[in-house]
Each structure stands twice: as C-alpha cells, then as structure tokens.
Amino acid sequence: MSFDLFAYRELKDVVPDCEDRYDMIERNLVQPKERGRYWEKQSPDFLNQMEGYLMELEDSLMDIRDFTYRNYEIKASRILLLFYTRFLEIPLLSRMDAVREYVVDDYETLAGRDLNEEEQQYFYEQFMAMYETRDIYVLYSRFLESVGMCPLPSVWYEKRLLRYEDVYPVLYLKYSLFRCKNHHGIKHVVVDEMQDYSWIQYVLLRKLFPCRMPLLGDMAQPLEEQQQDVLKFLPKIFGRDIRKIVMNRSYRNTMEIAEYANKLTGIQDMELFERHGEPV
C-alpha cells in the first residue's frame, strides 16, 4: 500500500475524498504560484506553527463544567484536575473520553450497578459537549486562517475535498489530537522514491512506524520540478545513526543515452557501464 492510500483511508472520518498527487502536479503546471504553497505546508516551519496551535487548543477548545446525573455530581474543578493532570498524556480530543470512563466507574461503584446503554450514551454526550468542536477539518481550517492562509471551504462533510497539499498536515493534526491505532506490530517498512517524500511525511512515518525503514530513491527522478535534499534533513528526523549507501553505477542504459541524460540533469559522478548503442 502506498503512503498516499494509507493517508486517504485514515482521513475518511474527516473528509470523504482527497485530491490525488498527480492531479495536484497538473494543477500546479497551469498555476505555478500553487507550487510554493505546497512546499510551505510540508515544511518544518509550518509544522512548528501547528505545534504552537496545538498548545493553544489545550485551553481554547475546552468548556469544562459541572456534571450532574440524578444524585451524583462531580464539580468542574475535579474534572479539570483529571483532564489536565491525571490524563494529560492522552491526546487532547481523546482525553475527555478517559475522564468519562473514570466518572462512569465512579458512579457505578457508588450506585452499585452498571449503567445501561442509554445512560452510557448520556454520559458520553455530556462529556463530549465540553469540547467546542472535535472536527479536525474545522480545526485545521482555523489554523490556516490563524497563520494568514486561506481557510478550507466551509461545507458539509459530504462535499469536502481535501487538496493534496493539505492531506499530510491534516493527518498530522489528527494523530496529534486523537489517540490513534499504533502500528508496533509492523517490523519493516520500505519507502520507495524517497526523493519525493516531504519533511512532514517523514515525520509521520517516524511517528507511525517505529521500526527498521530502508529508504530507496533516485535524486535524478523527482516528481516535482523543485528538488529537495532529503539526505540533508533525514538525520534531524531519524537521528544521526542512519546508514547511507550511494549506488552510482548505471546498468540500465547505453553510454550514449546515460551521458545525454546526465547533461540534462547535471549529474557528474555517475559510473557508466560500458555498453554502446545509437548516438543520441
């Protein structure tokens, strides 16, 4: 499975559809200004801005208040303590559910009985209402606006279409705010065409798959016109204990084709296999 397909599947609860990367590339050919916006949204600076936004949400997203059910009451101050102390390590939009489970256990212990399905739903709705919103699409749109970018179209779920430039930032926001499925059972991930992966994609790969990860690529074959030096920033994400193997001997083409291609790409350190053909 490609990383794009994985991302689209993980975002199904946020948007019903996402733009394909090749559609974005075609769009950028006729709208060159769009290309710069794509790289801006994949950058470390953009990610740092999002981290600042996540910290702001810890307070701005919450409306914590007293909870009462029949003769049972838990004060807002107690809920605040649970939310910001006991369960602080849980991502923000999953944290109140942990508080709810704690309160349900407390109530059932005091009442000497289990809550029925209808009561469980009531507890859930009341505690989820302490969030101003849990909609990742809305939260990301607000973030874009806060950093001076155009917000996403304000439409119902069924009409949402996420541009490719926003796919991985939205996925990062979701994984930062929700307790998502871990992938610790996966022991090996192979990344092909490594030259086409952005900073934020590598950050997500590192976060999702803490396993061995061979990265394969060809710096002379990027999808995008703007090239990035992946090897320069990878140690900042994966640490300096990485091993680089450069294979610069070409077996696929005749010397005439390879020399012509190297002139176009500016590659000078390629070792050519001595096999001749027609002049180019």
Predicted regions and their residues:
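Catalytic cores of large soluble enzymes that bind and process phosphate-bearing ligands
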Residues: Q42, R95, R249
